[in-house]
Amino acid sequence: MTNPDNMKPVEATDVESAAEKTSEPTPASGTSTITQRWKREDLIKKASPITRGICLLFSLIAFLIMVSNKHGYGRNFNDYEEYRYVLAISIISTLYTAWQTFAHFSKREIFDRRTSILVDFSGDQIVAYLLISAASSAIPLTNIFREGQDNIFTDSAASAISMAIFAFIALALSALFSGYKLSTHSFI
């Protein structure tokens, strides 16, 4: 028999010793796998409402900052479409995350389990997209205003935009957790 790699041939004793070194999984290793899964699922159950609560906080702050951004003629958030968009999406995000947080902590089932998981996932995705869309639409306008002069109006707008971005990050994490729940949930 030829050896194309110029290696020494494998002997029967080498195969037997390798077989002895491998061991069958013990019942304890199966138990630890189940325990690890339970811990992971428990972490997901705790992390999802926490990230939604953080999103609620940042959305509410973005809303409050943008509403209070009125500093006279030409320095009113209501004069600019982009800032009104940030305000509207902050309101939507605040309402959505407040509803989700309330639904979680009240422990009441509004929908059946399958529908609830689908609403969580799709709602997180849609609202996260709206948040980043609103922030990215207002950033260029704020940069143009900052080139002219830097004042409290642009600082407030930049703060509201930053809070919307932080809300997006929190809700994007929540969407990951919702996606994990959706992918591991059996609908049988």
Curated annotation (Swiss-Prot):
Cytoplasmic-facing ranges: 1-46, 106-124, 178-188
Biased composition (Polar residues): 24-34
Topological domains, Extracellular: 68-84, 146-156
Transmembrane segments: 47-67, 85-105, 125-145, 157-177
Keywords for this protein: Cell membrane, Membrane, Transmembrane, Transmembrane helix
Region (Disordered): 1-34
Main location (coarse class): membrane
Topology of the protein relative to the lipid bilayer: Multi-pass membrane protein
GO cellular component, as recorded: plasma membrane
Keyword Phosphoprotein: no
Pfam families noted in UniProt: CASP_dom
The name this protein goes by in its record: CASP-like protein 4B1
Source organism per UniProt: Arabidopsis thaliana
Lineage: Eukaryota, Viridiplantae, Streptophyta, Embryophyta, Tracheophyta
